[in-house]
Amino acid sequence: MSYEFDENFDVIVVGAGHAGVEASLAAARMGCKVLLATINLEMLAFMPCNPSIGGSAKGIVVREIDALGGEMGKNIDKTYIQMKMLNTGKGPAVRALRAQADKALYAMTMKHTVECQENLTLRQSMVDEILVEDSKVVGVRTATNQKYGAKAVVVTTGTALRGEIIIGDLKYSSGPNNSLASVTLADNLKELGLEIGRFKTGTPPRVKASSINYEETEIQPGDEKPNHFSFLSKDEDYLQDQIPCWLTYTNQESHDIINNNLHRAPMFSGIVKGVGPRYCPSIEDKIVRFADKNRHQLFLEPEGRETEEVYVQGLSTSLPEDVQKELIHSIKGLEKAEMIRTGYAIEYDIVLPHQLRATLETKLISGLFTAGQTNGTSGYEEAAGQGLVAGINAALKVQGKPELILKRSDAYIGVMIDDLVTKGTLEPYRLLTSRAEYRLILRHDNADMRLTPIGREVGLVDDERWNIFKIKKNQFDRELTRLSKEKLKPIKETNEKIQALGFKPLTDAMTAKEFMRRPEIDYATATQFVGPAAEDLDAKVIELLETEIKYEGYINKALDQVAKMKRMEEKKIPENIDWDAIDSIATEARQKFKKINPETIGQASRISGVNPADISILMVYLEGNNKARRKVD
């Protein structure tokens, strides 16, 4: 069947949440003609749940998005009300930035960026159907029967896909924050042959700031020391007038209220059918699962400068409204709090991610990509990271250029995508530092060193960003070389100076770099002995130098592991392989291989239920086939 289109585009993005805006901006900046279609323009880049960006692992993802040329980091740096570096007392691998956002300003600023982007058309429109011919995407059809042609379509519908909001016994069709649900498109994706799952997430009630007794809570201020998500942001623009958050706790009375009303909780009454997030459970789930805990932390997070709404982080719930009010009033500082919005659960459809390639293109339909919560993840940052990769690959496909696959050793975004397409997910997927085996080389401070050259290669990093990156890289390389050459000798004058600083004297000559490997020696101390750099170094360059030098041994071990895995990743598996023709592999492995259809030996080795013996048999089989082909040739 051929279609007559009202308008033609290179790439169409369906849904303008955090995944959709990154996908559409990336494709447009790479030179494609892009349509971004969304149900409600007022929901563009909206934060329906927590009013924050970043956090453990997630903050590193935002830095990665920025390093590649994405928008989230720049946008939050313009609109935050508080900034805080987490895990500063721990090693560099787990440090991550978190910002409290001005929720309305964040969405408004991102909307303006999208509206001003060259090559990008923004349209309020509900897409009801993905149009396909011969297993290839050709466009979309809207609810108003407009047909738009495209060579690639990226679906980023989030929790709107057959969304249903649940509060107590009440259940109704809705996307997040009472927006319209996308039901017809959900039916269409299933009709196209995609396997669909059903997940659930939730959000806490919001209370009025002026009704909170802050004297009964603990203040949580932001950092005075400048930190930014974007590598383009400047320290002189760092916000000093930050708004604090506040800490309080549930108590025994709170827990009794929940336990006495579990029969009315949708999670336990059978109303909620979708699988909820393990790492962000509802308060009723926490009380049941952790019955031995006598209290749980709650953070009171302002939603912006020009609003009275305060987000009660840690109190996600779908309990009936009257129970939510009673629960809030049992909490210290909230005894007289006015509830502005009730918490709710939302169930929604997802595309089971084992059906995707590492580019986020579906295996079933050429040119159809999915990203964000549509793929079963949770969180704005995870969504934005996927949206960026999907948008880049949609543009590359249209342009006939090689695809971009971020490896596990490249980025947390690569870890997430590999987890999704290789292992799938049975619950809303959240990124954690523990998921990354190479986390010491996937740090907050080196995201640009890892990814900006990749962003430049695909055409997403502009000249301004590239020049800033080159200056930093050149400074780092020159100073590392100098520190590797400059020597300290165990002479009397040097040792007296070292001892005066309270450190152990030298017994042998060593380079300044070797001297800095001592835990107590920082860059400033080392330069007291070898002199300063020939140029003023940026503080971020110094931070990077200290980390790379002090952890060099561990970093080199990680790089050795990366090299070994690279050899596995380079061993491709033919797309048309007959898994039934391979003798001796375990039944479970055969079933998993058929379901996931891994593209490389490396990916095959990471599938759960596949053991090393199965991989060895697979490699022998592939080598035998290669030899047979060589003889024929």
UniProtKB/Swiss-Prot annotation:
Alphabetically ordered keywords of this record: Cytoplasm, FAD, Flavoprotein, NAD, tRNA processing
SMART domains: GIDA_assoc_3
Main location: cytoplasm
Swiss-Prot/TrEMBL cofactor(s): FAD
Domain of life of the organism encoding this protein: Bacteria
One Gene Ontology term from the biological process aspect of the record: tRNA wobble uridine modification
Gene Ontology CC entries for this record: cytosol
Matching Gene3D superfamilies: FAD/NAD(P)-binding domain (3.50.50.60), GidA associated domain, C-terminal subdomain (1.10.150.570), tRNA uridine 5-carboxymethylaminomethyl modification enzyme MnmG/GidA (1.10.10.1800)
GO molecular function: flavin adenine dinucleotide binding
InterPro entries with a match to the protein in the record: FAD/NAD-bd_sf, GIDA_C_N, MnmG, MnmG-rel, MnmG-rel_CS, MnmG_C, MnmG_C_subdom, MnmG_C_subdom_sf
Binding locations of NAD(+): 276-290
Cell compartment(s), UniProt: Cytoplasm
Oligomer status and interactors: Homodimer. Heterotetramer of two MnmE and two MnmG subunits.
NCBIfam families: mnmG_gidA
Alphabetized HAMAP family for the sequence: MnmG_GidA (MF_00129)
Similarity annotation: Belongs to the MnmG family.
Primary role: NAD-binding protein involved in the addition of a carboxymethylaminomethyl (cmnm) group at the wobble position (U34) of certain tRNAs, forming tRNA-cmnm(5)s(2)U34.
Protein name as it appears in the record: tRNA uridine 5-carboxymethylaminomethyl modification enzyme MnmG
Gene symbol of the encoding locus: mnmG
